[in-house]
Amino acid sequence: MKRENRVVQLSGWGLSLVMVLVMMVTSIAGQDAGRKKFLKKPLVIEDQGSFFIGGVPKVTNYATLPAPNAANPAPNQITIGQMYVQFQIPANKKSKAPPVIMVHGSTHTAACLESTPDGREGWAPYFVRNGISTYIVDQAGRGRSGFDQSVIHEATSMIRSGDVQNGTARIPNFGRITDNGAWTAWFGHLMPAGSTILTGTLMRHGDPGDPATDDASHKDTYLPAYPIGAVDPSIVSRNGAIAQAPAGPNNYYALDYYKQLVPNAEVTLPGSTCAACQPSELSPANTWTPRDLALLVEKLGGAVVATHSQSGIMGHHMVRILKERGHLDLVKGLITIEGGCSLANSGLKAEDFDNIPYMAMKGDYAATSMQCQETVDAINARRAEGKGIAKAEYIKLDELGPVFNGTTHMMMLGTNNLEIADVILNWADENIPPKAKKVRK
């Protein structure tokens, strides 16, 4: 009798547990159903993953920081200069479309290519949705690619031992755009002129009193095409803030976008030299990421490379490296978005792009880059001479219509980001692979 009661009791507990689990799953499903989706619609992929490419071994006594007055630890090996790669392959690939590699700019990582600060679809999934195998990277020395901490440890150890001058000289200068620096670079101004964040206030382009800018072609009658309203309420209210608060407005200092700004830790890597480049001394940024991009292009058997801002010149250095290896044919296209386009800096010539489609692009708040214009003109001069077949074009979004009004430097995160992506995709459809002009008889 007692055993029967126990069975009944256990059955009751089991039924109660099942009911609790069902309620939990139902609750979670309900919460998920109400969640705002980042993607426009389900994304069908064949494969996705991540890997690292490139890098070299380094033996160092400073993989860790020795304690004060302690002997240096035994040598250890670390790997530096590698690059993190994340990819998605669509289930329905566009016929004959090469993969695209997207490269972020200064102070950013590949996060800026995944989704927008207000929770919308980013360029990477949108390209996949359009049938393009897409690879996004964290520059060597940045984000998930990691940096060389031994440089800082060695400098610290030297300073502790009394060699302050040489130790201090070894400490790298980490560049990082500040929150208000990003604002004044891309979204508006700090007013009045000459003020600091403690004495002046932030103003959007297009707000009343927006001063005329020297370089931008935008009109002061419209606002940046950017999700400036996507803010963190906790930061707006200055919860846990350190030091004195800026003059405001607080919401302009609380953009969710600011959270993805990171130090340019590639400065911990060594630089290099390039005999064909002007100047011949190359920064760490223009040394490692171009090498890794070249390796990635070779691994993929060819790709289009789309760069932004700081990485613009890196894309050109990558082309040079592939040229030196006899693999220029693997570059299926080079796209430079508000970045450097100098052929001389990267050791290239216009003839190197005879069979490589080349596109430069600018938004609404940047002046026309004479450097990019000159490169496009030099390539097209060869077309006028009947040399080469690949298209070269400088697309200025501010000339294409109202949908591009207010396009900022961070256009991949803007409110019109997918319209801009369509411009790139349509250009690629028309020009990659390059088509020889038919000779009229």
What are these model-derived regions, one by one?
Residues 34-94:
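N-terminal cap/lid segment of alpha/beta-hydrolase-fold proteins
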Residues 287-303:
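Conserved acidic catalytic loop of the alpha/beta-hydrolase fold
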Residues 93-95, 100-138, 142-144, 148-153, ...:
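Short, surface-exposed "cap/lid" segments of acyl-processing enzymes
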Residues 14-26:
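Bacterial N-terminal signal peptides
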Residues 407-441:
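Catalytic active-site module of serine/aspartate enzymes centered on a nucleophile-bearing elbow/loop
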Residues 305-306, 334:
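Conserved alpha/beta-hydrolase fold motif
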Residues 336-397:
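The feature captures the conserved acid-bearing segment of alpha/beta-hydrolase catalytic domains
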Residues 306-315:
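Gly/Ala-rich beta-loop-alpha elbow adjacent to hydrolase catalytic centers
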